[in-house]
Amino acid sequence: MSPFSSAFRPRRIAISALLLAIGALASGCSSIDRLSQIGEQPKLSAIDNPTAQPGYKPVQMPMPKPEVASYNPNSLWRSGSRAFFKDQRAHQIGDLLTVTVNITDKANIANETQRSRTAKEDSGITDFIGSQTVTQPLKVLPGRLLTTDSTSSADGKGSVNRQEALQTNVAAVVTQVLPNGNLVVEGKQEIRVNYEIRELVVAGIVRPEDIQSDNTIDSSKIAQARIAYGGRGQIMDVQQPRYGQQVMDVLLPF
C-alpha cells in the first residue's frame, strides 16, 4: 500500500462523515415526523390566520395621492356599488371571494445561431537599412517576419416546447386593504386523496372593480399573482431524489 493512499484515508473518512452529518441535518425534524406517520395518511394543515404564518410580510405598493371622498346627498346609489341595497362583493379585511384559476399556457420557441470568421495577416520587411546582413546568418526571411492565422466558428440551437393547463376555483380571504383601495387576497386549498395531499395556493392583489357581481374574480386580473399547485405524500416522496443524493448534487463540483 502506498503511503499516499494511507495518508488520504483519514481525509476520505472525514469527508464521508461530514456528508452524512449534512444529510442528517437536511432531513431534520421533518424526517422524524414522517417516521412517526408511517402507515398513516398525511395530515391536513391547520386553518390559521394567513397574517400570523411564519415569514408573512405586509404588501407595500406605490400609492397615488389620497382623494377627498365626495358624497351625493340626493342619490340613492353609493359610489362604486353594483347592488341597489348593499354591495355583496368583498371589500374589507376578512371578506371572502372566489378566485377562478384558468391558466392555459403554450409556448413553442426555436432558435438557431451560426457564426464563422477567418482572418489571416502577413507582415515583413524586405530591406531596411541593410537588414539583410543581419537576417541572413539567422536564416530569417525578411518578407515573412510575422504571420497570423485565426479561425473561429460557433453553432448553437435551442428549442422550447411547453404546454400547461390548470382550471379550478378556490376561495380566498382579504388579508390587507391598501391605501388606494386595492385588496391583498390569499387562499389555500388542500385535498387529500388516499395517501396524497394536493395543495393549491393563490395570492395577489386585486381591484375591487374587477370583482364580479357574484363575488368572483378571474386569476388573470390578479396583480403580482402567486399560484402554486403541488402535493405531498407517498407519490411526491417517490418523485423526489433521496436526501443523500440532493446533498451530493449541491456539494460535488463535478
UniProtKB/Swiss-Prot annotation:
GO terms for cellular component: bacterial-type flagellum basal body, distal rod, L ring; cell outer membrane. The keyword DNA damage does not apply. Pfam families: FlgH. Keywords: Bacterial flagellum, Cell outer membrane, Membrane, Signal. It is found in: Cell outer membrane; Bacterial flagellum basal body. Assembles around the rod to form the L-ring and probably protects the motor/basal body from shearing forces during rotation. Belongs to the FlgH family. This is Flagellar L-ring protein 1. It comes from Bradyrhizobium diazoefficiens (strain JCM 10833 / BCRC 13528 / IAM 13628 / NBRC 14792 / USDA 110). The lineage of its organism: Bacteria, Pseudomonadati, Pseudomonadota, Alphaproteobacteria, Hyphomicrobiales. The gene is flgH1.
